[in-house]
Amino acid sequence: MRSANEPDATHVAVLLAETIVALRPALHTGAAVRCVDATGGRGGHSAALLAELGAADTLLILDRDPSAIAALRARFAQDSRVYIRQARFSQLAEVLAALEWERVDAILADLGVSSPQLDEAARGFSFLRDGPLDMRMDPGADRSAAEWLATATEADMTRVLREYGEERFARPIARAILRAREQAPITRTLQLAELIAQVLPRHETGQHPATRSFQGIRIFINRELEELEAFLPQAMNALRAGGRLAVISFHSLEDRLVKRFFRADDYRISADVPLRASELPPLPWHPAGKALRAGPRETRDNPRSRSAVLRVAERSERHAA
């Protein structure tokens, strides 16, 4: 059995040192600390958090993927500080209530698809490996990508590919899918990837032609942006005064949501309101430092870290009572 300090060779935690450094001010308070890893994956960030925590501290680990839960339970079976729950991170408030945890000190969410999910063809996330066109992070949830593609309208497919995949050729791809499924069901990852490659212009280089489309379908199938929008306020409301939330995002749609939320734009008063700065109410939280990206060494050793962005926010004193 792998120990909690032993890394999982199939998955490398992104921005690991930077995340721990950013959360460290919330982890050493002189009292018993409670932390949450809202996206446990294979436990890389969790293990680093546990190495930072003391014997009286506790860590709650969440993941929606049952295979990740099994791996986490095996990895941390001998650590009594760890609580593991299979849940979406949008269920954070519900899980904390069940544990009777009123406040926590630090929360981490790594929004990326884990390497085991990408590398295991049977999960249906990869356009490089042939497998069933599934893409569900929780295989028992709702419909698969193949089931959606079998009935989606051209308008729906175009919207998903354009909004979630930021695909410029969304409509031609949607039309090609409609034509292809009239001949045979689209049920395999390489079947869809090859279809998309035939549609995109040959001069489109720099990444696999199916990258954006697969991203868009995956985000839609797993309701990833809706999950994130539900998670962020729950996480911030769960923090004690001075507690910190760290979020690692991997594409611009996620990062824009996180950036806007961390800036507390919904709580800001218009500059047209005639109030002095001293009269303005304090914001409920504020960004803690600048956004961080992986350095040259990490991007060389782990190419999947190239698009990662770490943002951290701290709960304000007057709003965490």
Swiss-Prot record:
Catalytic activity line of the entry: cytidine(1402) in 16S rRNA + S-adenosyl-L-methionine = N(4)-methylcytidine(1402) in 16S rRNA + S-adenosyl-L-homocysteine + H(+)
Region named Disordered: 286-321
Disulfide bonds: none
Lineage start: Bacteria, Pseudomonadati, Pseudomonadota, Acidithiobacillia, Acidithiobacillales
Keywords in alphabetical order: Cytoplasm, Methyltransferase, rRNA processing, S-adenosyl-L-methionine, Transferase
Assigned protein family: Belongs to the methyltransferase superfamily. RsmH family.
Localization in the cell: Cytoplasm
Molecular-function annotations in GO: rRNA (cytosine-N4-)-methyltransferase activity
EC number: 2.1.1.199
Name of the protein this chain belongs to: Ribosomal RNA small subunit methyltransferase H
Residues binding S-adenosyl-L-methionine, per UniProt: 43-45, 63, 89, 110, 117
Keyword S-adenosyl-L-methionine belongs to the record: yes
Function: Specifically methylates the N4 position of cytidine in position 1402 (C1402) of 16S rRNA.
BP GO terms, sorted: rRNA base methylation
PANTHER family referenced in this protein's UniProt entry, alphabetically: 12S RRNA N4-METHYLCYTIDINE METHYLTRANSFERASE, S-ADENOSYL-METHYLTRANSFERASE MRAW
Key word Glycosyltransferase present: no
Enzyme class: transferase
Basic and acidic residues: bias regions: 295-304, 312-321
One Gene Ontology term, aspect cellular component: cytoplasm
Pfam families in the record: Methyltransf_5
